[in-house]
């Protein structure tokens, strides 16, 4: 029951009330989309100020103990002060949650799962999640937003949101991971998420900031309201083109996201062109086909014309070496279309040695 209370307290949100200060593919937590889900690419970057974040949270924890702030009806003392530690596992989860929450703006996930439905590090269990949105490019701004709840909490202001502050000062929380995601397409560019855990031994490695990246996010198909396909409309026989499928999550705005995996692709004529599960079209013979991609109840089609023949570019690989007793064999594979052919290398009929030179006891001799 204590966990349920802690989670209920922790699941609160905060957005800034003032004016704005300023306006590599990263994998998801699962290796393939869950049932009824797809992977999309969300553009953005991660900011890391992990050392400064831990330092600031511990300052807030120490202050609460020194000032006797109450937790669960009991005043904290300096004996209650326990420095919180960084968790590499929680940080990874917080980064995923920051990207998701930049779109949902709440404690909900685009894949329909619980915000605590992750593989957690060690033997512990999460106690709370806190979120913040702002216009900065700093991880510390979110922490200061959570800290701003202190006054209302100490005064006992009715109806005040204080779960972020109490998550930081609760001595039972021993580990934290914070993720800050900068998404220029979001309502607030900066989304900062943190998750807390109690006891357990965990890796404390801190991740670095990233440049502009494509973050892989799992999305429930029901969240997709429209899809559109783009790419080359023609391909030569034996060559390949990649079509791009983009999806709009209508409930969360008009931004379109590239679908990375989970869509169903098909061709209207597999003798003319084939298509892979990721939208790679291979021309097989002259003709026109319709390529269709389906995500849930949404689909998009694209007409592709296959023209000409492949101008083969072969790479050779010896599969059997020729000897004086038997023929050799070289496999030639076209780098464009994958066509294979074998070239026979006739067996060696004779061997002629040329003049050689060697040194023996410091003296050079010819043979």
Language model region names:
Residues 11-26:
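Sec-dependent signal peptide cleavage junction
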Residues 69, 138, 184-190, 252-257, ...:
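Short, solvent-exposed loop/turn segments that connect beta-strands within catalytic domains
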Residues 221-350, 357-367:
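Extracytoplasmic soluble-region selector
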Residues 202-221:
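A short, surface-exposed interaction/processing loop segment used at functional sites
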Residues 115-206:
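A well-ordered secondary-structure block
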